Amino acid sequence: VNDPFITTDYMTYMFKYDTVHGQWKHHEVKVKDSKTLLFGEKEVAVFGCRNPEEIPWAAAGAEYVVESTGVFTDKDKAAAHIKGGAKKVIISAPSKDAPMFVCGVNEKEYKSDIDIVSNASCTTNCPAPLAKVINDRFGIVEGLMTTVHAMTATQKTVDGPSSKDWRGGRAASFNIIPSSTGAAKAVGKVLPELNGKLTGMAFRVPTVDVSVVDLTVRLAKPATYEQIKAAIKEESEGNLKGILGYVDEDLVSTDFQGDSRSSIFDAKAGIALNDNFVKLVSWYDNEWGYSTRVVDLIRHMHSTK
């Protein structure tokens, strides 16, 4: 672990106690010394370097590094971890030039000679599997996506300056805040056949975790809502099990807290205007689900060695 801003005892505290996900109830987590954490009996080295090139990943035996600062998101900057001895870098955010992979959608296109990848965003991971099913079965002519997104750390607790996004500077816990998102367009990067066919926006809302996507699309091949539901249910129990979920109960956002799936289709929430125009609703735990996909992508990358 590398973090130049916090100490090992504070790392332990933050890991053990989480406002959203509760207390850590599994193996003991404690501090061995200022440069080592203990997860059960396993030692984890801790560094405090500001420059990724200076982190001794090789000495620690770290082959796969998750770049989750939000700062080093392009290939050149993320490559600094390679200079520090890492073999592969997984960027936990969209990247303008690193190849983007979404588990269940295009991860099989990964080749072992690719050293720096992006796991896309939590929001892209939600509509992408859903859009893949719909496009494969019925074809998507065009579509609009809206994510109703829980608060994140980039927002303000009270009104504050935000010169690039004036609305984004308003108090997160007291407002519904319209915002931009590249998540829908990014679906076109992992599903090239949808490139240019999807775009979208976001509403930031005063909840702390779990978000929901509204994907409204025009279909190439007519289909009833029942046929669409059946196709999604079939894939959720087959090829996309563990990635795409299906629920037909009257659930709300907190019911999906801690759900490790990327996208949980809500059969009762969607509607169809006609057999060519449909609104699909899918939930995601933007923290837990996305973190699980990062691990899944690393596992897949390792399996290609």
Curated annotation (Swiss-Prot):
Active site: C122
Cellular localization per UniProt: Cytoplasm
Catalytic activity line of the entry: D-glyceraldehyde 3-phosphate + phosphate + NAD(+) = (2R)-3-phospho-glyceroyl phosphate + NADH + H(+)
Keywords, in A-Z order: Cytoplasm, Glycolysis, NAD, Oxidoreductase
Binding site for D-glyceraldehyde 3-phosphate: S121, C122, T123, T152, T181, G182, R204
Any one GO MF annotation of this record: NADP binding
Site (Activates thiol group during catalysis): H149
GO-annotated cellular components: cytosol
Oxidoreductase recorded as keyword: yes
Keyword Oxidoreductase: yes
Pfam families: Gp_dh_C, Gp_dh_N
EC number per UniProt: 1.2.1.12
The protein's annotated pathway: Carbohydrate degradation; glycolysis; pyruvate from D-glyceraldehyde 3-phosphate: step 1/5
Superkingdom field: Eukaryota
Assembly information from the UniProt record: Homotetramer.
Biological function: Key enzyme in glycolysis that catalyzes the first step of the pathway by converting D-glyceraldehyde 3-phosphate (G3P) into 3-phospho-D-glyceroyl phosphate. Essential for the maintenance of cellular ATP levels and carbohydrate metabolism.
Note: Plants contain two types of GAPDH: cytosolic forms which participate in glycolysis and chloroplast forms which participate in photosynthesis. All the forms are encoded by distinct genes.
Family: Belongs to the glyceraldehyde-3-phosphate dehydrogenase family.
Protein name: Glyceraldehyde-3-phosphate dehydrogenase 2, cytosolic
